[in-house]
């Protein structure tokens, strides 16, 4: 193995190039390309995600707006009826029919149940219970001084409620329930004990009790979910209720029942063109009221954990979206209903939709690009590795002697010149040994050139194993070698040369199958400390001259001076 001293003053670029070879450069470039392609794909995914969320909100918003407008129409009607009653309380009409109704009330108020009706074709009947029934609870009272005005106002409400009925409305029933023991409803009641049970059912409902001044100080519309068993089909309903007040006195409650079936039918009609997703309507306690799923299909209901997560998000904003497992749920609060409308979009629907197709295509493109990139990386990495190996091999062949595996003459002179310059600047010793194998020509003549090659290779191995780690050695001629000893004085160089001479002389070489041969070497030594000259060619020339003196003096010896002061060892 050749020995080489690493120079401390090598540039940072060469050190970096030595640490990061072509393979590292290729790896880094491909890693950067893959990183940027992944970031670009991720950016596209984020844009696609935002577009998907916006699409979900747009679909939900369109249905929510239609439902909200329909509910607003019903709420406006309820407020209109409340305002009409309020005006009738403040300025009652002086019609004889109304006065006659008041008189009839005074006559019938003690009855267990009673009914007042002005005109069956134009107004709705008024139903009531006895004074004794009203006196049973503190919630009800007939002590109002405006009882007569409330009675006539309720009869006027019957006229308005009949006129305001429309097939486009969602409501099943509109009613006014008074704290004074009577009620009016768009659904007729058979005359009899059903009047008492129905009034009792009304005044015990949450939508009536919760409208007291203490429980509803804002006096606005409130929504309630209830099942009313007296209805023939016993269907589930939501009820909007609005209190009637005047001069800080609570007269009663105007209410409107909306069947859940009507809301379901409306949702299905509104979402019939939207083949993806399912709409669900929840009340203010996140209880499912209805959904747009077909009758033969099971709704995608939320479990308790998902409902809790959704409730936490709804508290933060009036609309938004949330990923719950394989479902994406977008939600929006309704302006005219105390609840929230949800759109549930499953993963399967998402994959089958437009955004799913785009996502799959984008994923396949990224996978294809990444696969091509990895294949290209492997091919180029293999090519670069082979080229790097070939380059190193060619460089090694250009700098080394293939037989002895030491530096050739050109490489040795180049490296030695750089070392000499460095040690001259550092004012450190620098020595050179010139070595020649004795009688080498006779080995070629007697045993052939193959034997000569074995001798050269054997001698080079002994030289390389004897010199120090930072010394360098090279073959400069046929059987001639040069050894550069940076940092070695002339005395140290002489010791090293002596070790080399002894090892070469002591080892026998097998030149043929049955013949061994012992060789010797003559050496000349020069050192920069003699004349202060660090020019390598001059030092090598001086060592070569002293090598000639050693051969003239009998071979197998070392010459370290110009004439007679050579040291001889046998």
From Swiss-Prot:
**Protein species of origin:** Salmonella choleraesuis (strain SC-B67)
Where, by residue number, does substrate bind? 444, 449, 453
Domain GGDEF residue range list: 428-563
Give the molecular function GO annotations. Answer: diguanylate cyclase activity; GTP binding; metal ion binding
Q: Any stretches that span the bilayer, and where are they?
A: 20-40, 360-380
Protein name in UniProt: Probable diguanylate cyclase DgcQ
Annotated site residues (Transition state stabilizer) in this chain = 441
Q: What does this protein do?
A: Catalyzes the synthesis of cyclic-di-GMP (c-di-GMP) via the condensation of 2 GTP molecules. Cyclic-di-GMP is a second messenger which controls cell surface-associated traits in bacteria. Involved in the regulation of cellulose production.
Q: Pathway listed for it?
A: Glycan metabolism; bacterial cellulose biosynthesis; Purine metabolism; 3',5'-cyclic di-GMP biosynthesis
| NCBIfam families according to UniProt | GGDEF (TIGR00254), PRK15426.1 (NF011955)
Binding annotation for Mg(2+): 436, 479
This protein's major location comes to membrane
State the annotated membrane topology for this chain: Multi-pass membrane protein
The cross-references to Gene3D superfamilies, in alphabetical order and at most eight, read: 3.30.70.270
Where do the catalytic residues lie?
479 (proton acceptor)
Name of the gene this protein is made from: dgcQ
């Amino acid at each position: 193995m050749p020995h080489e001293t690493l120079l401390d003053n090598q540039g940072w670029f060469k050190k970096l190039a030595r640490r990061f070879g072509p393979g590292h450069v290729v790896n880094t470039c491909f890693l950067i390309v893959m990183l940027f392609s992944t970031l670009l794909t991720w950016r596209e995914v984020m844009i696609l995600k935002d577009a998907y969320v916006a699409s979900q909100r747009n679909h939900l918003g369109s249905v929510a707006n239609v439902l909200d407008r329909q509910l607003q129409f019903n709420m406006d009607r309820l407020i209109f009826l409340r305002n009409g009653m309020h005006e009738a309380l403040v300025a009652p009409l002086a019609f004889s029919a109304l006065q006659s109704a008041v008189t009839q009330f005074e006559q019938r108020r003690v009855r267990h149940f009673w009914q007042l009706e002005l005109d069956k074709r134009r107004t709705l009947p008024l139903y009531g219970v006895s004074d004794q029934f009203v006196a049973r609870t503190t919630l009800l009272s007939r002590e109002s001084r405006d009882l007569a005005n409330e009675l006539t106002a309720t009869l006027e409400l019957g006229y308005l409620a009949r006129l305001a009925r429309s097939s486009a409305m969602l409501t099943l029933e509109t009613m006014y329930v008074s704290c004074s023991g009577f009620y009016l409803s768009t659904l007729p009641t058979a005359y009899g004990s059903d009047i008492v049970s129905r009034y009792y059912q009304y005044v015990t409902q949450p939508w009536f009790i919760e409208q007291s001044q203490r429980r509803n100080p804002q006096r606005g519309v409130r929504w309630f979910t209830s099942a009313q068993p007296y209805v023939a089909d016993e269907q589930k309903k939501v009820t909007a209720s609005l209190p009637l007040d005047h001069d800080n006195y609570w007269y009663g409650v105007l209410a409107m029942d909306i069947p859940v079936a009507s809301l379901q039918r409306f949702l299905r009609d509104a979402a019939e063109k939207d083949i993806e997703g399912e709409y669900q309507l929840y009340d203010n306690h996140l209880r499912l009221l209805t959904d747009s799923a077909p009758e033969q299909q099971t709704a995608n209901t939320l479990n308790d954990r998902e409902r809790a997560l959704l409730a936490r998000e709804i508290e933060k904003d009036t609309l938004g979206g949330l990923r719950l497992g394989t479902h994406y749920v977008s939600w929006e609060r309704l302006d005219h209903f105390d609840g929230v409308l949800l759109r549930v979009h499953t993963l399967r629907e998402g994959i089958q939709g437009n955004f799913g197709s785009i996502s799959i295509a984008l994923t396949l493109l990224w996978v294809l690009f990444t696969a091509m990139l990895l294949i290209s990386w492997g091919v180029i990495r293999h090519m670069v590795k082979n080229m790097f190996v070939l380059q190193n091999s060619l460089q090694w062949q250009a700098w080394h002697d293939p037989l002895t595996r030491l530096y050739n003459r050109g490489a040795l002179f180049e490296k030695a010149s750089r070392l000499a310059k460095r040690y001259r600047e550092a004012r450190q010793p620098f020595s050179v040994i010139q070595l020649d194998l004795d009688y080498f020509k006779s080995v070629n003549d007697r045993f052939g050139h193959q034997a000569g090659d074995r001798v050269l290779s054997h001698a080079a191995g002994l030289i390389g194993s004897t010199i120090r780690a930072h010394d360098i050695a090279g073959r400069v001629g046929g059987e001639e070698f040069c050894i550069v000893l940076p940092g070695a004085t002339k005395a140290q160089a002489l010791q090293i040369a002596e070790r080399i001479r002894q090892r070469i002389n002591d080892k026998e070489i097998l030149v043929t199958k049955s013949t061994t041969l012992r060789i010797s070497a003559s050496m000349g030594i020069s050192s920069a400390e003699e004349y202060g000259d660090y020019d390598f060619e001059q030092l090598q020339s001086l060592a070569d001259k002293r090598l000639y003196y050693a051969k003239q003096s009998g071979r197998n010896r070392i010459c370290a001076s110009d004439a007679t002061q050579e040291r001889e060892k046998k």
